[in-house]
């Protein structure tokens, strides 16, 4: 039976051309800073983001956590959104590893603004934790792949500078934002002190993320990466996959966005499904299921039986994610399955 797997863009697999690039990659010992392919990737990302330096890490979680460690002190507080990845999906690492607590605000579909952040800054009082860092996520996973307006990022960053607070951007899917808007990585990252980017989601690399910032930040991030077991030796085979992805896979994200919009428009016409198509900005579609029509968990189960895999995202919410291995034919296969179940 045909299977259309829309659970996540982390399901992407290396293409034959990417595997060839990995197989022929020049490698060295990266712990000694001698892997030429990793160095090439780090230099490329530093240039693309407009930062002084970059550091290859094994995962987005590792990238975010070394960024928190490098820019905070134990006992401080980090401002973030209550639906962000750092708060929900990193195993409490901010407390476990950095010794900081998260002040998770109720953003609008995951997005914060200057007013929210300004109100969350702690007074200078011995009773309160000191605010140490602001974290944003762009695009926002639980927000449905929505994009931070560049002007809002600017307002937040300018306020943060006035408070002498660094801003970290979880940009795991920032690639999607750049493709959707035409705004470059450098333009987005000018309003951050540090940024993490992921290669193993829509870009299709098997492993790896990267953080970028000034040289002092990268020096500290390097220390924490090593402390967390992230020092790798001949990692150029992984960096080669990332370099191939940037060159060959990045433009294809536009097709994921087009399919997500078309998918949302079709779902919008179905009884029992609520998803305003205009809210779909990139490759993620999160839709509400009317519990009077069908239970969300039951819908996910019935879809799976019929060869369509999705992820339940709450009592009444389901997420579908378009990615490198999803075709127009896959979308055309999935939609009649919905109609049959909802009939």
Predicted segments, located by residue:
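Conserved PLP-enzyme active-site core in the AAT-like
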Residues: 1-278, 282-306, 310-326, 333-342
């Amino acid at each position: 039976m045909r299977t259309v797997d829309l659970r996540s863009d982390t399901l992407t697999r290396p293409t034959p051309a990417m595997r060839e690039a990995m197989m022929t990659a020049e490698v060295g010992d990266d712990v000694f800073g001698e892997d030429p392919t990793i160095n090439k990737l780090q230099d490329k990302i530093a240039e693309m983001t407009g930062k002084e330096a970059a550091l290859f890490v094994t995962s987005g979680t590792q990238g975010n956590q070394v960024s928190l460690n490098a820019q905070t002190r134990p006992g401080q507080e980090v401002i973030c959104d209550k639906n962000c990845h750092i708060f929900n999906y990193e195993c409490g690492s901010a407390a476990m590893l950095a010794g900081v607590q998260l002040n998770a605000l109720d953003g609008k579909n995951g997005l914060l603004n200057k007013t929210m952040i300004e109100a969350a800054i702690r007074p200078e009082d011995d009773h309160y934790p000191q605010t140490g860092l602001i974290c944003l996520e762009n695009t926002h996973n639980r927000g449905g792949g929505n994009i931070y307006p560049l002007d809002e990022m600017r307002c937040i960053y300018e306020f943060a500078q006035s408070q002498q607070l660094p801003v970290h951007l979880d940009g795991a899917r920032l690639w999607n934002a750049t493709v959707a808007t035409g705004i470059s990585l450098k333009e987005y990252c000018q309003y951050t002190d540090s940024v993490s980017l992921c290669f193993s989601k829509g870009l299709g690399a098997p492993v790896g993320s990267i953080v970028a910032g000034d040289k002092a930040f990268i020096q500290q991030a390097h220390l924490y990466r090593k402390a967390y077991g992230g020092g790798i030796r001949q990692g150029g085979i992984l960096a080669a996959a990332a370099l191939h992805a940037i060159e060959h896979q990045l433009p294809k994200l536009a097709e994921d966005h087009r399919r997500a919009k078309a998918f949302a428009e079709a779902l919008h016409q179905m009884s029992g499904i609520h998803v305003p198509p205009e809210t779909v900005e990139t490759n993620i579609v999160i839709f509400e299921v009317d519990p009077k029509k069908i239970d969300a968990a039951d819908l996910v189960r019935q879809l799976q039986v019929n060869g369509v895999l999705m992820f339940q995202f709450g009592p009444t919410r389901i997420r579908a994610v378009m990615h490198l291995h999803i075709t127009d034919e896959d979308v055309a296969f999935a939609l009649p399955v919905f109609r049959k179940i909802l009939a």
